[in-house]
Amino acid sequence: MALLVEKTSSGREYKVKDMSQADFGRLELELAEVEMPGLMACRTEFGPSQPFKGARITGSLHMTIQTAVLIETLTALGAEVRWCSCNIFSTQDHAAAAIARDSAAVFAWKGETLQEYWWCTERALDWGPGGGPDLIVDDGGDATLLIHEGVKAEEIFEKTGQVPDPTSTDNPEFQIVLSIIKEGLQVDPKKYHKMKERLVGVSEETTTGVKRLYQMQQNGTLLFPAINVNDSVTKSKFDNLYGCRHSLPDGLMRATDVMIAGKVAVICGYGDVGKGCAAAMKTAGARVIVTEIDPICALQALMEGLQVLTLEDVVSEADIFVTTTGNKDIIMVDHMRKMKNNAIVCNIGHFDNEIDMLGLETYPGVKRITIKPQTDRWVFPETKAGIIVLAEGRLMNLGCATGHPSFVMSCSFTNQVIAQLELWNEKASGKYEKKVYVLPKHLDEKVALLHLGKLGARLTKLSKDQSDYVSIPIEGPYKPPHYRY
């Protein structure tokens, strides 16, 4: 696709695959709104006061129908928005078209190359001569990463005149990042510094992105305040758990049509995502084996009736392998060589480095056969046996299906709206330093409360005597911050 920014009749910038899908996107968006009570409640509560009036928000988060409802919630509260996806395969093109036509600048399409992906990220951050965004909604931390790497390169350039060298790294994706920054230095050597100075803060959606933020906080390089949305209970214990329980089998069946019952499924990692995946596979009739480094998580898996072994113990016996760790080098090419014919290998953690895709792609004599988009069979020359890799090792639930359903994403995205409001409303108060924060318990409980009515729930209320007895306010919060749920 030619990397040229287009404009709507109203002058809004965009780059999507097919604007003719906008009507279809709008229909699905309207269906999703009914399933997203938290976001709709935010529009009702905050819309009249327009709290985001004057705010520029950049989003780097899967451009799905559910995200479209989030974007239109931000614009309904007064924000101006520019958006890109955080994954080359996760965009739903009809959702991107609907938003680009009706609501916000979007730069996203399904099946981007890495070069296109980072071009889209750069466009979403580009607000013209006035600098960058005021706020970032991030998923995985790529938008945050680009600004931090850009600032670092500009400081080196100012001191030494040295520009980034893309050949200094073996990572093909980071080579692209360095090339983008290098080109930017020639146009404006203070581009990313201007972004940093304007930025009020970022709210981060995922475990992987949160890890990056805490690493930067620890080494003193975090450039602006950050709110860790992932560790809100109404995100991690719902989106990560129940969302993956829903979307893993959906992606597997759409990609392969394989029968899960009777198969041996290996879930690498037993955190919230791994727990949801293991539950889905067990319910579908698979025999589930978990790999873990953490003895507490391992014991939890055992108490659920699952086996806990190493990958090496089961690599030649299992039928389905799912990585959920957020770490790298979980399934290596040497593991894949030992797998049975047509074993399915997929990732639902975050980045594609959980599975050794580079090692697979460069394995001598390996043959790649594309069955359909995001479903590839890789045949090893010495055995003539093949494995099926989904979504090129990236998020299979978004690459091979449509991700998590609207209701559970409403919980996550309501947290995002609240986090963005918190950062924006406190921008002049000094409340938030260059650190990582978590939303307070009363806001977590508010997000849950907004979703109960949709499911027909009625809460019991504490009496005054009961409240005094347990030292819990009648209106909450009901649990201390350290409570684990």
Curated annotation (Swiss-Prot):
Free-text comment on the cofactor: Binds 1 NAD(+) per subunit.
GO biological process: DNA methylation-dependent constitutive heterochromatin formation; embryo development ending in seed dormancy; one-carbon metabolic process; post-transcriptional gene silencing
GO CC terms in record: cytosol; plant-type vacuole; plasma membrane; plasmodesma; vacuole
Keyword terms, alphabetized: Hydrolase, NAD, One-carbon metabolism
Native source species: Arabidopsis thaliana (Mouse-ear cress)
Amino-acid biosynthesis as UniProt keyword: no
Function: Essential protein during embryogenesis. Adenosylhomocysteine is a competitive inhibitor of S-adenosyl-L-methionine-dependent methyl transferase reactions; therefore adenosylhomocysteinase may play a key role in the control of methylations via regulation of the intracellular concentration of adenosylhomocysteine. Required for DNA methylation-dependent gene silencing.
Catalysis: reaction(s): S-adenosyl-L-homocysteine + H2O = L-homocysteine + adenosine
Gene: SAHH1
Protein name: Adenosylhomocysteinase 1
Binding site for NAD(+): 206-208, 271-276, 292, 348-350, 397, 404, 479-483
Family listed: Belongs to the adenosylhomocysteinase family.
